[in-house]
Amino acid sequence: MLGLHVGTLISLFLCILLEPVEGSLMQPCQPINQTVSLEKEGCPTCLVIQTPICSGHCVTKEPVFKSPFSTVYQHVCTYRDVRYETIRLPDCPPWVDPHVTYPVALSCDCSLCNMDTSDCTIESLQPDFCITQRVLTDGDMW
């Protein structure tokens, strides 16, 4: 009985001790400026811009004992409030609409991943990945 009590106290002490370390190493879920690429099928260039996206740590719990009858929901850092902006891609042929709309994060939240607004994959392409030739927003080529 005493061993169980001491083990509980040690666990509690470690949680209190490590809490500031964990908090300082992991950024909270919040909007951050990120370089992203905008491209469209049929247009020869990829426009690289800076825009706020949601990024950061969300507390999640993985159950020790997994049951086939229970569902585990993992929370991710995703958009709470979002505004959409439209930009014109350069050098698109006349038959391709050169406009691309992208989300701008106004605020973020730890919640279930919404496939309509977020990339919920484990390993995805970087946000500034381009298939076509890259162009910076100030006109410089990469």
Swiss-Prot record:
Residues annotated as signal peptide: 1-23
GO CC terms in record: cytoplasm; extracellular space
Subcellular location, principal: secreted
Cellular compartment(s): Secreted
SMART domains membership: GHB
Biological processes annotated in GO: G protein-coupled receptor signaling pathway
Pfam family, one: Cys_knot
Gene Ontology molecular function, alphabetical: hormone activity
Keywords tagged on the record: Disulfide bond, Glycoprotein, Hormone, Secreted, Signal
Classification via InterPro entries: Cystine-knot_cytokine (IPR029034), Glyco_hormone_CN (IPR006208), Gonadotropin_bsu (IPR001545), Gonadotropin_bsu_CS (IPR018245)
Presence of keyword Signal: yes
Glycosylation-annotated residues: 33
Keyword Disulfide bond part of the UniProt annotation: yes
Cystine bridges: 29-77, 43-92, 46-130, 54-108, 58-110, 113-120
Function of the molecule: Involved in gametogenesis and steroidogenesis.
Family stated for the protein in its record: Belongs to the glycoprotein hormones subunit beta family.
Subunit structure: Heterodimer of an alpha and a beta chain.
Protein name from the UniProt record: Gonadotropin subunit beta-2
Source organism: Oncorhynchus keta (Chum salmon)
